[in-house]
Amino acid sequence: MKPFPTHPDAIPAELQDVMDRLGTVAIEVANRIARGGIDEDLAGLCGTNTDGDGQKALDVIADDAFRAALEGSAVRFYASEEQDTAVTLNEAGTLALAIDPLDGSSNIDTNLSVGTIFAIWPAAATAEASFLRQGSELIAAGYVIYGPQVCMMVSFGKGTQKYVLDPGSRSFVLVDRAVKVPPSSTEFAINASNYRHWPKPIRAYIDDCVAGTEGPRGRNFNMRWLASLVAETHRILARGGVFLYPRDSRKGYEQGRLRYLYECAPIAFVITQAGGGATDGENPILGQTPSRLHARTPFVFGSAEKVARITAYHDLPEQETSALFGNRGLFRS
């Protein structure tokens, strides 16, 4: 059975074969994760990627599986977070696909949700021209989350769709054609242990949230942090709120840590197509052009009003971002 047997009109015809291949591998990866520790150690380190990050066994397994499945498809160029350079799969192909085959792999041994993130552009004459372009030129992007449910969230530029894997039929079932980010929430996601390294506008925003009912926001907030981008994204699509991974003062973190091509652009596409916002803290993510395949960027996304508020904190005068929370010239609701 094909992985998307129902609602064939939901996927553009020119992308149907590629989506079938992605879906088939995602189902295989989900099964492999479910048997982790029985057949093999999926969490064991087996090398490093181009940026020196440790690669788990499942990182490599997933990358190899997606790449092999896309051979002979309409994908001309394949760029993976796990590989130094892009590769040509089909000289006659019309698409360029970037992928993070296994996002959140540091969570494998803890049984927290991990995922696959993908982005599809029209192929240009070269791999560099295909991938080093604005995220606004994407024709499709999405992610698969391997959790208590296996879900795929995907956009083809006309809203965001949600599919759930039916374990019985081993196929993805369309359950929502028009996912929307809830407009408000009292949740924010950030790694607070890095507070001392953040820029002042980010510290000011978090200070005002942490101040709760005693601060200018006049309400209490909850902090979340899962260290799995797909899990954070899935929660925000379900409950709203905002995710922040800012630049900071540490060496190697001047532009954040998340990669534009494999993580930020596709997630921003999914979120904005669902009515949310996505920026680098100040400017829209989808309006940016990466300088190299593994370029990084600060990343803020979630409910549109929350993202706009964080941008407003960057517009405050220096003395206000340094001031106690009661003195900022911002809207307070």
UniProtKB/Swiss-Prot annotation:
GO cellular component: cytosol
Amino-acid positions noted as binding Mg(2+) 1 in the UniProt annotation, renumbered to this chain: E81, D100, L102
InterPro entries in UniProt: FBPase_C_dom, FBPase_class-1, FBPase_N, FBPtase, Fructose_bisphosphatase_AS
Assigned EC number: 3.1.3.11
Alphabetical GO biological process terms: fructose 1,6-bisphosphate metabolic process; fructose 6-phosphate metabolic process; fructose metabolic process; gluconeogenesis; reductive pentose-phosphate cycle; sucrose biosynthetic process
UniProt-listed CDD domains: FBPase (cd00354)
Binding site for Mg(2+) 2: D100, D103, E263
Pfam family, one: FBPase_C
The keyword Cytoplasm is annotated on this UniProt entry: yes
Keyword Repeat set for record: no
Catalysed reaction equations from the record: beta-D-fructose 1,6-bisphosphate + H2O = beta-D-fructose 6-phosphate + phosphate
Obligatory cofactor(s): Mg(2+)
Any one Gene Ontology molecular-function term assigned to this protein's record: fructose 1,6-bisphosphate 1-phosphatase activity
Residues that coordinate or bind substrate: D103, G104, S105, S106, N191
Subcellular location: Cytoplasm
Associated pathway: Carbohydrate biosynthesis; Calvin cycle
Superkingdom of source: Bacteria
Self-association and partners: Homotetramer.
NCBIfam families: PRK09293.1-4
Alphabetized HAMAP family for the sequence: FBPase_class1
UniProt family annotation: Belongs to the FBPase class 1 family.
Full protein name: Fructose-1,6-bisphosphatase class 1 1
UniProt organism field: Cereibacter sphaeroides (strain ATCC 17029 / ATH 2.4.9)
Lineage: Bacteria, Pseudomonadati, Pseudomonadota, Alphaproteobacteria, Rhodobacterales
